[in-house]
Amino acid sequence: MTKQTLTQLEQHDLFLRRHIGPDSSQQQEMLNYVGAESLDDLTAQIVPESIRLNQELSIGDSCGEAEGIAYIRGLAKQNQVFKSYIGMGYYGTQVPNVILRNVFENPGWYTAYTPYQPEIAQGRLEAILNFQQVSMDLTGLDLASASLLDEATAAAEAMALAKRVSKAKKANIFFVADDVFPQTLDVVKTRAECFGFEVVVGPAHEAVNHELFGALFQYSNRFGQITDFTDLFAELRAKNVVVTVAADIMSLVLLKSPGAMGADVVFGSAQRFGVPMGFGGPHAAFFVARDEHKRSMPGRIIGVSKDTRGNRALRMAMQTREQHIRREKANSNICTAQILLANMASFYAVFHGPQGLKTIASRINRFTDILAAGLQAKGVSLVNNTWFDTISIKGLDVAAVNARALAAEMNLRFDADGIVGVSLDETTLRTDIEALFDVILGAGHGLDVAALDAQIVAQGSQSIPEALVRQDAILSHPTFNRYQSETEMMRYIKRLESKDLALNYSMISLGSCTMKLNAAVEMLPVSWPEFANMHPFCPLDQAKGYTQLIEELSSWLVNVTGYDAVCIQPNSGAQGEYAGLLAIRKYHESRGEAHRNICLIPQSAHGTNPASAQLAGMQVVVTACDKQGNVDLEDLKAKAAEVAENLSCIMITYPSTHGVYEESIREICNIVHQHGGQVYLDGANMNAQVGLTSPGFIGADVSHLNLHKTFAIPHGGGGPGMGPIGVKAHLAPFVAGHVVVKPGRESDNNGAVSAAPYGSAGILPISWMYIKLLGSNGLKKSTQTALLNANYVMKKLSEHYPVLFRGRNDRVAHECIIDLRPIKEASGVTEMDIAKRLNDYGFHAPTMSFPVAGTLMIEPTESESKVELDRFIDAMVSIRAEIAKVEAGEWPADNNPLHNAPHTMADIMDPAFDSRPYSREVAVFPSAAVRTNKFWPTVNRIDDVYGDRNLFCACVPLSDYE
């Protein structure tokens, strides 16, 4: 037996061999098949020599899981989790353990993809529909989205919607009440500048004095005051002003709904419905509007349709509004949102039910009443005379109060004008009220919580005016009234999970989506209280662990990208695009070239690119691609020269969206630079760059990084995501700042793009762990293995399907595109048929019809083993044989396993199945693999047209699920 060295024995838990799917023997077998001697040899065959890095990354060695956990545990301990009363949109909450364990920490929920294949996503679609129902019930409006990124960006989306739908077409002013949260105003101003809107800020009642297209109000406001806006809203709407409201979701359990006051749009954060603060995120925003505005809504909307058997089925509705179809004409660039967190919030509402929510909200309000009564009894003056959970105090010795608060390990809100704010939440206890009295008043105040409570009960609370007390019922649907025991809740969550296909069942080979392993060790720290329970606006000296983690992650990303600086703030890839384009815009403005507003975008680009360019106030000019899928250099040269005076930038993806490393990438960069433009390199395909090349080395100026793709943050069924941007030094002064927390950059005065200074900081430990565990060598090997897996799949499938684009040496990058158009022409079988048939084989379909209609784009990632790759290949080969039977006339074009896919249990139990020209076994057990491990779609193919023509986006009768 060969003896191992001690060093080798010490590497027993190295993460690298857990993350990469094929073991060394499988890799060699695959290399032999594709015709390469080694991973380095394959890399040399694929990546153009001119852009290959000539040095290794300088991140450090890979390490074991135990070592990585120990290190990040040390960082977590540097965070001081004080009791937070800061509020401002972020509140303490108690995550029900049944949700924490069965949803937040469950790969069946967090590794799924956006439900573009609804037949295998009915579980989370139902959970999201519940979220929409909660949003509609509490706001009193007609139609809700499936989630937006955060409250502040939802405000910006509300402003954009207001302009789209307002009948005051000549108006260009958006009014913002001066008592909204400052971070919300910050993000709104950033967006308004790009659109050329004027933002007027003033007291709410002054809104009627301006010619507006829209207005924004906070309910309750930043000081805690609750205002009845009914008359004001009526007056504004009579002037064709679109009224938008930022609302607190917990307060709406007790308060009159904004919809009942006449609001057009209501939005806010669902964070306090069972989602930790996470130093700023991720959290789902709710967004609800009147039915008449449905075509102008941003983001995804879940609707009810029917399948081919006539059964109710859920799907994403009205997708023609979205960026992947409408491109620069889309309502929004929203792509990845916050579905996992929306699901948590919806389950929170289901678990507590209307009565439980009312108890929680009433307790918060009662404690606030007690706190206010005690302070007023001692002569303390309050700014507000109505409240739900927040009081604002004036006339205090701020320095003394702050000192006592810090000594008691609590954080209050201290405004610049000397006002001290206190916001209570679900976690507040009696003892906390006593401690607050001690901090605010000092020792010896003599106040007694029980006595104050008895006084309030006897006299009646006046904190919520009678006219603002909610009178209508909420959450009356049976779903919110039958799962209050943990047993029932656990089983309900499991029933929904079992309807969905996620990475814990099989490979998800979606091209341009990088559905790699989200390792358990990477996910563990996210639930730790030291990371989960930090308020984003706490004093930074309490967040030393977070600060160090963000600094280390940023330095690693700088090294990986070849840029000079990184901004962590954008909380999705689309937001990263927007933030990067804003930096370019501000750079041109600083040079006296504000007229540079044209963005060149290849016709193959992802739909978010033109949508983001439009958000940044740019005009899109599309450049052509040649027959090989590369940017047409002659067309680019001509258009760059034509618009040279006004050229702002080009947005290009690398490797291209066609899955190849374009040889001319540096020439493309040079052409744009020669005409005064900047190069935005979309980081969607960064998984094919890490350790081999980099955007900065190639010649780009700015990129966003999808941490939820390349750096292992899970997709969550449609979010969360993170989209930090890397920039060259000349753009660094122009990245996003923040009005509340100064990140310590030159860009402090730049507007924000997200509500929190570091975006969804709560999931940054995932990417930190991913990079720390893999190290320089592991990151490079992951990229090389992704190339190997893609080329292995490509070569295997090329024997059965045409491969549309290949690069040098007949290779692809990390993904390949198979062309199904000849099959459709010969047999009538479509890419949709093949996608749905893959469900019967236990697979999620690859990306359909992007970047070319009638194709499938396959990205296997480095995490899939040869065994799983072969299972997928076998399924595709088997499907090709089925297509051949249709081509030969053995099966009718309108009655075959592909046309009828996917197949359900109901199908094979139906006696009428006997009339089909294929057997039940062919329908549901088409391969040996699924006979022993079968995933069952729960609905047949869904009728999208019916769903959009009969739009219904609320909970359906419970009998439909029984």
Swiss-Prot record:
It catalyses: N(6)-[(R)-lipoyl]-L-lysyl-[glycine-cleavage complex H protein] + glycine + H(+) = N(6)-[(R)-S(8)-aminomethyldihydrolipoyl]-L-lysyl-[glycine-cleavage complex H protein] + CO2. The modification N6-(pyridoxal phosphate)lysine is found at residue 709. Keywords: Oxidoreductase, Pyridoxal phosphate. One of its GO terms (biological process) is glycine decarboxylation via glycine cleavage system. CDD domains: GDC-P. Its cofactor is pyridoxal 5'-phosphate. It is an enzyme of class 1 (oxidoreductase). One of its GO terms (cellular component) is glycine cleavage complex. The keyword Ubl conjugation does not apply. InterPro entries: GcvP (IPR003437), GDC-P_C (IPR049316), GDC-P_N (IPR049315), GDC_P (IPR020581), PyrdxlP-dep_Trfase (IPR015424), PyrdxlP-dep_Trfase_major (IPR015421), PyrdxlP-dep_Trfase_small (IPR015422). Transmembrane segments: none annotated. One of its GO terms (molecular function) is glycine dehydrogenase (decarboxylating) activity. Pfam families: GcvP2_C, GDC-P. Its EC number is 1.4.4.2. The glycine cleavage system is composed of four proteins: P, T, L and H. The glycine cleavage system catalyzes the degradation of glycine. The P protein binds the alpha-amino group of glycine through its pyridoxal phosphate cofactor; CO(2) is released and the remaining methylamine moiety is then transferred to the lipoamide cofactor of the H protein. This is Glycine dehydrogenase (decarboxylating).
